[in-house]
């Protein structure tokens, strides 16, 4: 009978899931398992009885039971077939109830074992949580201390950067020739060293802070994971520990979030101030280089101008000496019969042009250009030197005419050489006088030629050959008259002597002209060299400007990388807040259940 009842019970649970649902639902919703078992038994009996009755709905799950006494033996004998069937069904239901109670008792034992196990596990997890919570607290304190160290290192770095900028600005305002330039340069080097050390200390502190923040976040997450395991315990003491742990954990998470926000603010502020300091430094360097470039550009223009002035001055001197050389060569040609015409050919074109211009306009441009120099410089110098040499020759017994002629010749040569030397020295050392002299000579020559060239071309086109012939005749007759007035003999020997002397004079003047042009070339080369050095310094400063632009670009890129780090920290903080919110929602759902 028991086996039959068991089979009926099992088949009832299998075929009608409402039996299991009614029993299990009562067990889950009540903490008093004995009452739950009694109610479940009544629900099972009511459900089974409803299935056996034809007019009963299967949805009825509860009936009111009445206590009945079992029938006596006499009553059993008097029972009809219907009564016997009813008695049999009653015994069957009693057996079915006994089986259900035994199953419920076994399940109750299982639940009690599970509760004890959860209690032990809760106590163990509570200990682990307290340990993890202590570690999270220590890591959070370390993270807070690291943030303070980072802030201190940042302040030191800002001060060092400011000191470096001030030292560099002071150095830029000084000239390398100033007495305090070396001291300012040493101060810049020392400030740069301090700024580098402060930057390294700041980087180390930042790295330590990042590591401490990562460690604190990991340990806080570990505490959260342990806290999640606490939710399955049913022990009241354990529940109290869990509640206290939740409060501690929530406060720690909030504190960790605040510290992460502070660190993100410090990193962002440090990045922005670092970029501003770099921009200020690069602007100072750029302004210094720009001032240097302007200075070198002015030096280049000045040296180029000096070279041009020297070239113009030497050109004027060459013209003057060329004219003198041509005059002497032509005069010598008269006495030597053409032996020095090769030497005269160098300046003949200038002299012929001058004679043509003079014949056409009545004005000699060479005479007009050389009059100020001849009247105020060369003529007094020639007279002074000539008189000194004449007196010296007369003291040696030379006749007066010969001494005067030799003194005039030597005086002219020495005066020309002295004039060349003075102009070269002034051009190299005293630049202002040379510039004035060169400007005066070039202006006189330029204005004279500018006025006379149109008339020259016009007259030359009309009667060039006639003017050339007249000019040469005037030169020859003029030279003859000069020789006669000076008392020179006209015989062949005297002419040859005078011609040789004039050839020597012409040769000396040619050497002087060559020396003057060489000296001018050297002076011009010096100025060109100085201009080249100024141009090289200018190009170097320009390269430094390009390098500063490259450094500025790198600073902007570093700023972008630091912004990425800040974004990652913000993302980590948002993730921590999200996890905290999820844990809070989970706890809220469990408390409502």
UniProtKB/Swiss-Prot annotation:
Subunit-structure text: The core secretion machinery of the T3SS is composed of approximately 20 different proteins, including cytoplasmic components, a base, an export apparatus and a needle. This subunit is involved in the formation of a pore, called the translocon, in host membrane. Interacts with SipC/SctB1. Interacts with the SicA chaperone. Purified SipB/SctE1 assembles into hexamers via an N-terminal protease-resistant domain predicted to form a trimeric coiled coil.
Biological process (GO), any one: protein localization to Golgi apparatus
UniProt keyword Zinc, yes or no: no
Protein name as annotated: SPI-1 type 3 secretion system translocon protein SctE
UniProt remark on domains: The N-terminal region mediates SPI-1 T3SS-independent secretion. The C-terminal region is necessary for SPI-1 T3SS-mediated secretion. Membrane integration requires both hydrophobic domains and the helical C-terminal region.
Gene disruption: observed consequences: Mutant can assemble a fully functional needle complex and can secrete (but cannot translocate) all proteins traveling the SPI-1 T3SS pathway, but the mutant is defective for intimate attachment.
Transmembrane intervals: 330-350, 409-429
Main location, first listed in the record: secreted
Family statement drawn from the similarity comment of this UniProt entry: Belongs to the SctE/SipB/YopB family.
Region (Essential for secretion): 3-8
A matching Pfam family: SseC
Signal sequence range: none
Description of how activity is regulated: Secretion is regulated by the gatekeeper InvE/SctW.
Function: Component of the type III secretion system 1 (SPI-1 T3SS), also called injectisome, which is used to inject bacterial effector proteins into eukaryotic host cells. SipB/SctE1 and SipC/SctB1 are inserted into the host membrane where they form a pore and allow the translocation of effector proteins into the cytosol of target cells. Mediates the intimate attachment to target host cells. Induces macrophage apoptosis either by binding and activating the proapoptotic enzyme caspase-1 (caspase-1 dependent), resulting in the release of interleukin-1 beta active form, or by disrupting mitochondria and inducing autophagy (caspase-1 independent). The former is dependent of its membrane-fusion activity. Induces membrane fusion in vitro.
The keyword Transcription regulation belongs to this UniProt entry's keyword annotation: no
Localization of this protein: Secreted; Host membrane
Topology within the bilayer: Multi-pass membrane protein
Keywords per UniProt: Coiled coil, Host membrane, Membrane, Secreted, Transmembrane, Transmembrane helix, Virulence
Coiled-coil residue spans: 126-226
Classification via NCBIfam families: PRK15374.1
GO CC terms: extracellular region; host cell membrane; membrane
Domain of life: Bacteria
């Amino acid at each position: 009978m028991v086996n039959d009842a068991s089979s009926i019970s099992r088949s009832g649970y299998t075929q009608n899931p409402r039996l299991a649902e009614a029993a299990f639902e009562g067990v889950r919703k009540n903490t008093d398992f004995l009452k739950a078992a009694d109610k479940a038994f009544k629900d099972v009996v009511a459900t089974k009885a409803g299935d056996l009755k034809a007019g009963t709905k299967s949805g009825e799950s509860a009936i009111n039971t009445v206590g009945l006494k079992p029938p006596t033996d006499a009553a059993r004998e008097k029972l009809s077939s219907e009564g016997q069937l009813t008695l049999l069904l009653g015994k069957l239901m009693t057996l079915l109830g006994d089986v259900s109670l035994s199953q419920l008792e076994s399940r109750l034992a299982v639940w009690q074992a599970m509760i004890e196990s959860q209690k032990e596990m809760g106590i163990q997890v509570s200990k682990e949580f307290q340990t993890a919570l202590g570690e999270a607290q220590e890591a959070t304190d370390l993270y807070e201390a690291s943030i303070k160290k980072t802030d201190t290192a940042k302040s030191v770095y800002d001060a060092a950067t400011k000191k470096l900028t001030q030292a560099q600005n002071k150095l830029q305002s000084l000239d390398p020739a100033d007495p305090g330039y070396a001291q300012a340069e040493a101060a810049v080097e020392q400030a740069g060293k301090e700024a580098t050390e402060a930057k390294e200390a700041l980087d180390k502190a930042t790295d330590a802070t990042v590591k401490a923040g990562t460690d604190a976040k990991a340990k806080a997450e570990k505490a959260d994971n342990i806290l999640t395991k606490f939710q399955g315990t049913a022990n009241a003491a354990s529940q109290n520990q869990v509640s206290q742990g939740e409060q501690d954990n929530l406060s720690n998470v909030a504190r960790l979030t605040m510290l992460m926000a502070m660190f993100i603010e410090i990193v962002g502020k440090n990045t922005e101030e670092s970029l501003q300091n770099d921009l200020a430094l690069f602007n100072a360097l750029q302004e210094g280089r720009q001032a240097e470039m302007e200075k070198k550009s002015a030096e280049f223009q000045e040296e180029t101008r000096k070279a041009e002035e020297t070239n113009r001055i030497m050109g004027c001197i060459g013209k003057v000496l060329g004219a003198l050389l041509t005059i002497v060569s032509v005069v010598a040609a008269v006495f030597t019969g053409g032996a020095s015409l090769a030497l005269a050919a160098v300046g003949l074109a200038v002299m012929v042009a001058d004679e043509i211009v003079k014949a056409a306009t009545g004005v000699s441009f060479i005479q007009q250009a050389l009059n100020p120099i001849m009247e105020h410089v060369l003529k007094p110098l020639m007279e002074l030197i000539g008189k000194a040499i004449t007196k010296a020759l007369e003291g040696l017994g030379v006749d007066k005419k010969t001494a005067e002629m030799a003194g005039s010749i030597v005086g002219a040569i020495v005066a020309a050489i002295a004039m060349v030397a003075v102009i070269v020295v002034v051009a190299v050392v005293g630049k202002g006088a040379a510039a004035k002299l060169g400007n005066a000579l070039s202006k006189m020559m330029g204005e004279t030629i500018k006025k006379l060239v149109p008339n020259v071309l016009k007259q030359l086109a009309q009667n060039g050959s006639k003017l050339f012939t007249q000019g040469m005749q005037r030169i020859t007759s003029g030279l003859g008259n000069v020789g006669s007035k000076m008392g020179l003999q006209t015989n062949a020997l005297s002419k040859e002597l005078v011609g040789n002397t004039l050839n020597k004079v012409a040769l000396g003047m040619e050497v002087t002209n060559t020396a003057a042009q060489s000296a001018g070339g050297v002076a011009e080369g010096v100025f060109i060299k100085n201009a080249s050095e100024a141009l090289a310094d200018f190009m170097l400063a320009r390269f430094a400007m390009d390098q500063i632009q490259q450094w500025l670009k790198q600073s902007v890129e570093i700023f972008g990388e630091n912004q990425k780090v800040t974004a990652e920290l913000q993302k980590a903080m948002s993730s921590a807040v999200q996890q905290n919110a999820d844990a809070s929602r989970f706890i809220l759902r469990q408390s409502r259940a």
